[in-house]
């Protein structure tokens, strides 16, 4: 099964190079970096890192940032246009470890699953330096998802996932809607996978927040972005969005 990992990148100076350098041979067939607002220092860091690995790296650049959902969709478009059958999505800031990709792809390749969610909270998972308020939210939010979808979830906000590309081509799944340009996309796809009968499982992964200073560990702002994260579940459940 031809595989690709999509990594959205936005000003990950000093981080994206380390992420690339941790890739091991044969984990995936292709790495696709989607870079918003590229600057020379980021390009240089990526070029230096890609020399140290054997996995081919494709780069898509956006002069203006349009949102993480938009960036991931560009990766989807590339993957679908080039015949990739298995898609992995992960962070470009070092929170996710590329060496754990087989934990997500093996259930698809060998056990017949369609969609694999990485979880820091199932046995074997690990989390480090998670900000306190965020930790409280990410533990409580899956309870709501479980109640509304009927599928047990432990780590809905973890963006480290793998799934068959056929999910993206399902006519019941419309990832190209404009309202999915930002964080909504990931939760939209998660809801669709859980409610349309796809074979779903969680597998243990690590999640490490590299910085403890205010605003230094993530581009997400709780006050600004909370509805982009929470909204899709309720909008889809109520039928306000499709």
Language model features with spans:
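Hydrophobic helical membrane-anchoring modules
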Residues: 1-3, 14, 21-22, 174-242
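Short beta-strand/loop segment that forms part of the nucleotide-sugar
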Residues: 28-39, 58-61
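Acceptor/aglycone-binding surface of glycosyltransferases and processive sugar-polymer synthases
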Residues: 64, 70-81, 98-179, 183, ...
């Amino acid at each position: 099964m031809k595989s690709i990992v999509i990594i959205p990148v936005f000003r990950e100076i000093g981080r994206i190079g380390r992420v690339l350098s941790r890739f091991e041979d044969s984990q995936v067939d292709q790495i696709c970096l989607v870079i918003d607002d590229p600057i020379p220092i980021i390009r240089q860091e990526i070029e230096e890192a890609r020399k140290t690995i054997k996995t081919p790296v494709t780069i898509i650049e956006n002069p203006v940032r349009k949102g993480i959902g938009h960036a991931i969709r560009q990766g989807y478009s590339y993957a679908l246009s080039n015949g990739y059958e298995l898609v992995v999505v992960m962070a470009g800031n070092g929170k996710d470890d590329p060496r754990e990709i087989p934990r997500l792809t093996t259930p698809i390749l060998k056990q017949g699953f369609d969609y694999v969610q990485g979880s820091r909270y199932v046995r074997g998972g690990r989390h480090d330096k998670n900000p306190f308020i965020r930790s409280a939210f990410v533990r409580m939010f899956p309870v709501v998802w479980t109640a509304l979808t009927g599928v047990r979830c432990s780590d809905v906000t973890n963006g480290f996932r793998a799934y068959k590309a056929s999910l993206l081509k399902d006519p019941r799944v419309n990832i190209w809607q404009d309202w999915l340009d930002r964080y909504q996309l990931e939760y939209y796809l998660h809801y669709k996978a859980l409610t349309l009968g796809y074979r779903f499982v969680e597998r243990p992964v690590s999640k490490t927040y590299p910085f403890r200073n205010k605003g230094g560990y993530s581009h997400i702002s709780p006050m600004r972005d909370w509805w982009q994260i929470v909204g899709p579940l309720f909008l889809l459940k109520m039928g306000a969005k499709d």
